[in-house]
C-alpha cells in the first residue's frame, strides 16, 4: 500500500506501482490495468539464479514479501544503512522466500533479485536477458535486479494514464532519479532528472 502521506496530497489521483506493473485510481483503489509475471518466467528466473548467492523479493497486488534473513540484516545483502528502516517496515517476512514465490508464481506483479555487488548484478541480468523472453528488467538501486512482465515499466504506466486521460506526451511532466525512470523520462514531454540522480545514465 502507498503511504498515506503520498495518497493524501491534493491532485494526486492515480498511482503507477511495481515498476509499471499496475495502475490504480487512488480515490476508490480500483486497479485500472495490471500485468503479472508468467508462471513459466518465474520458474525460469528461480532456476537460472539458484546457484548465485542472492535472495529475492516478491510483490503481489502491491504488497512486498522478502526472506527473513534479508529483512533482519539488509546491509548483509548490499543495502545501504539508510535503507534498513524502509526495508524492515515495508517487507512482509517469509521464512522460505523461494517456496513462497513458487506457490504464488501466477500472481506476482514483479520480483526482485537482491545481489551483493555490481559484477554479480550484471551477470544475473546477462543470464536472464539471454534465457527469459517475456520479462522487463530494470533497477532503481544498486543491489536490486527488478523484474516484471515484458509490457510493464514506468513508461508503459505513464503512457496508459496519458491515453486514459485523453492527453498527449507533450502534456506530461515526469521526475526520476534512477535507471528504472529512464524510459519514462524519455516518453514525457518534460522529463526531469533529480539532482541526486545517476546523471550519466539519465542525461
Sequence positions of predicted segments:
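Acidic, Mg2+-coordinating phosphoryl-transfer loop and its flanking beta/alpha structural elements
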Residues: 158, 168-203
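Short, well-ordered alpha-helix to beta-strand connector turns
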Residues: 12, 108-109, 132, 188, ...
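Short, charged, surface-exposed secondary-structure boundary motifs
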Residues: 24-28, 148, 202-203
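Hydrophobic packing residues within well-ordered alpha-helices of enzyme cores
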Residues: 3-6, 124, 128, 199-202
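Short, acidic/turn-prone active-site loops that include or flank metal/cofactor-
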Residues: 20-22, 37, 142, 196-200
Amino acid at each position: 500500500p502507498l503511504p498515506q502521506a503520498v495518497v493524501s496530497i491534493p491532485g494526486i489521483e492515480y498511482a503507477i506501482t511495481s515498476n509499471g506493473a499496475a495502475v490504480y485510481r487512488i480515490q476508490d483503489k480500483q486497479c485500472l490495468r495490471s500485468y503479472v509475471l508468467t508462471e513459466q518466467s518465474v520458474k525460469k528466473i528461480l532456476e537460472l539464479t539458484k546457484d548465485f548467492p542472492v535472495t529475492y523479493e516478491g510483490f503481489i497486488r502491491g504488497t512486498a514479501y522478502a526472506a527473513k534473513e534479508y529483512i533482519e540484516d539488509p546491509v548483509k545483502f548490499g543495502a545501504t544503512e539508510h535503507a534498513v528502516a524502509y526495508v524492515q517496515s515495508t517487507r512482509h517476512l517469509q521464512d522460505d522466500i523461494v517456496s513462497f514465490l513458487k506457490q504464488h508464481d501466477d500472481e506476482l506483479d514483479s520480483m526482485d533479485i537482491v545481489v551483493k555487488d555490481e559484477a554479480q548484478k550484471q551477470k544475473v541480468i546477462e543470464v536472464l536477458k539471454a534465457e527469459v523472453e517475456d520479462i522487463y528488467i530494470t533497477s532503481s538501486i544498486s543491489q536490486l535486479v527488478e523484474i516484471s512482465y515484458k509490457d510493464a515499466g514506468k513508461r508503459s504506466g505513464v503512457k496508459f494514464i496519458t491515453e486514459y486521460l485523453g492527453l498527449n506526451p507533450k502534456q506530461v511532466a515526469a521526475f526520476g532519479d534512477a535507471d528504472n525512470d529512464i524510459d519514462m523520462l524519455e516518453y514525457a514531454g518534460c522529463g526531469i532528472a533529480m539532482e541526486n540522480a545517476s546523471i550519466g545514465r539519465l542525461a
